[in-house]
Amino acid sequence: IAAANLLLNVEGGNGKLGVVGFCYGGAIANFLATRLPSVAPAAPFYGSAPATEDVANIKAELLVVLAENVERVNASWPPYEAALKAAGVRYTLLQPPGTQHGFNNDTTPRYDQAAAAQAWQQTIELFNRTLRSAG
């Protein structure tokens, strides 16, 4: 949280912050979205969901990226989604068919080039739309 607050005030910044994380980092992206109202977008990739009672604190728009075949992480999605809906949080779920945990990591046999490209494109679009200043 301290690092995020430091980045918010960096010279030349626009006062907006986006977070992206993979695996454990995805869980951290979810966590930061519940703790920092200054987070504009968050893109957690196959990260564990935050506590449902904290979801109402989310002000960010989310791109939740899940692999199709990850039982533990995916089991937390239905209650997370219900909490997102109840809180009115704007989110998109991307769960490419046939993917495994870590599908975005090109150093593993689980890498899925098409799914990784789709997920990254949607992440960039979200960040451009929510972080760039008008003008």
Provide a role label for each language-model segment.
Residues I1-V20, T130-A134:
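Gly/Ser-rich "nucleophile elbow"/oxyanion-hole loop immediately N-terminal to the catalytic nucleophile
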Residues G21-G25, A29:
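Gly/Ala-rich beta-loop-alpha elbow adjacent to hydrolase catalytic centers
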Residues A40, N57-L62, A87-R90:
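Short, proline-enriched alpha-helix->beta-strand connector loops that line the catalytic pocket
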Residues S38-S48:
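A conserved short beta-strand
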Residues E68-N74, H101:
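Acidic catalytic loop of the alpha/beta-hydrolase fold
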Residues K85, R90-G135:
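C-terminal catalytic histidine-bearing segment of alpha/beta-hydrolase fold enzymes
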Residues I58, V64-L66, P96:
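Short beta-strand/loop motif that positions the catalytic acidic residue
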Residues N74-A83:
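Short alpha-helix in the alpha/beta-hydrolase fold that links the catalytic acid
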